[in-house]
């Protein structure tokens, strides 16, 4: 395992252990990084994602392309401290899309204050979500060149991510036709069952009601994205558990909503992703393990079919954060180790550099919707 100490090692990577003989010489070498931030508060996750997205967009053009898959299991319980870990006893927060207003989405600001719920404005579009140990977050930060066969827009990115990253049942039949031995997708890599689908810009539970002769559509995952010249970010919040009473106390039924919602109340519109998962996925951590396996097969397939690019799938373990360093290690081409100083450098470079002046869009908000300092809410942090 290599230790990453500076920004260049991520954004302009050198690969000393690469066997060039195994790669066609005319192929450009790229890296897709996997980072698990399950012990982070969502606020720091969003700051990290925004920093990686903007820095990648500005610094990797014409050089090695890089990308990131970032996961956060907010359901994970942490009852004790190990080393320098921060323990978040209160991760409750409402996250608003970049254009959303508190008055249009928050039902009762007094309830927010009394229950010590933090308010966050994120750097991407989309709707408003409530996080309280109830969601599995998956983010993709990728160069536009990652997808060679079609142009990705905000209007089609959910369809693309569904078909490319998540529709594993379809890919079993499509990809193994090319090379069964090198591309051995099997049932161990299936993430979802037949009820998982997409509709408009959401991931949904889709079924047919035989009695009433109508299609049932319930939201199981919300998506948001941001596009820049060279990169896009697409993140998903999968609903693991639904506390409808708490949602009703906090979130309004928004005036701007997808057509298929049809003004349904939260309890009639939102559904746990668990109804859409393959039979052997019982926990968010198992989902993450399956996702890692599946992404590795996606990269293998991409390397077989892409004549110009070769992608490595590497993991960045965060020192004192990722306890199980060797978990799923066989699915990564390489594993790096980094400490919080590196993340702090990444954020500070983005937050303070003149290259990104006034670009930052992720902030804490007060009850009136005004931007406040990163220390406004009393939560422990890793790199702020």
Curated annotation (Swiss-Prot):
Record keywords: Apicoplast, Mitochondrion, Plastid, Transit peptide
Record carries keyword Zinc: no
Cellular-component GO terms for this entry: apicoplast; mitochondrion
Mitochondrion in keyword set: yes
UniProt xrefs under InterPro entries: aa-tRNA-synth_II/BPL/LPL, BPL_LPL_catalytic, Lipoate-ligase_2_inactive
Location of the protein in the cell: Mitochondrion; Plastid, Apicoplast
Gene3D superfamilies: Bira Bifunctional Protein, Domain 2
Chief location bin: mitochondrion
GO molecular function (one): lipoate-protein ligase activity
GO biological process: protein modification process
Residue intervals of the BPL/LPL catalytic domain: 79-303
Function text: In the mitochondrion and together with LipL1, involved in the lipoylation of the E2 component of the branched chain alpha-ketoacid dehydrogenase complex BCKDH-E2/BCDH and the E2 component of the alpha -ketoglutarate dehydrogenase complex KDH. LipL1 is responsible for catalysing the activation of lipoate, forming lipoyl-AMP while LipL2 is required but is not capable of catalyzing this reaction. Although its role is unclear, it may catalyze the transfer of lipoyl groups from lipoyl-AMP to BCDH and KDH or act as an effector protein.
Protein name, as recorded: Inactive lipoate--protein ligase 2
Organism field: Plasmodium falciparum (isolate 3D7)
